[in-house]
Amino acid sequence: MKGKKLSLWMSGLMMMTCLGAMAQQKITGIYLTSADYIQNKMTYTETNGHLYKARLYALAPKDHILLTHGGEQTKLEKDRFFALQLKDGKIFHMKGGESYELLNRNPQLFLYRRKLPVSPKTYPEQSYRYYFSTGENNLQELTTRNIKQAFVAKKDLPERLDAAFRDNDDLMAYDTFHHMYKLEWLIK
């Protein structure tokens, strides 16, 4: 019995250590505004060969991230920056305790995806929910109806959307000829 408790306790300790290590990510930099993102202008970038580490608080979301560099820590409110880029190149926008991966650099229409928790039974399939925003406006779920409402000034857009996409799942189709999402091409 004592051996089981010790084993359980050690497993829990190792899991907490691993989760703590995963919570800190090396970042390439931070985009303070959407204009900075469009122009690829980052702050908090690598200095003297050392990257910043960001504590993202994924398990217990907070309204800030904690940047560590050279033993110094900087607390940065999530609503004070547009996005951060991880070392692996992925770029994330933080909103309301959630992380949304940015998929494009179109100033008229930003496309995002958020990974949804899945059951182990569906392995290895990844499940995502897609969103969009126009500039720095609020995120909305990516649906044809929401796109039509967001771009009311484009009078011919509703008909072009209906002709190009059968349903909401088609909205994330990628155009390999133009090297952009088809939705971006239609909104140009």
Each language-model region and where it sits:
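C-terminal partner/receptor-binding element of secreted or periplasmic proteins
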Residues: 150-188
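Bacterial Sec-dependent N-terminal signal peptides
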Residues: 1-28
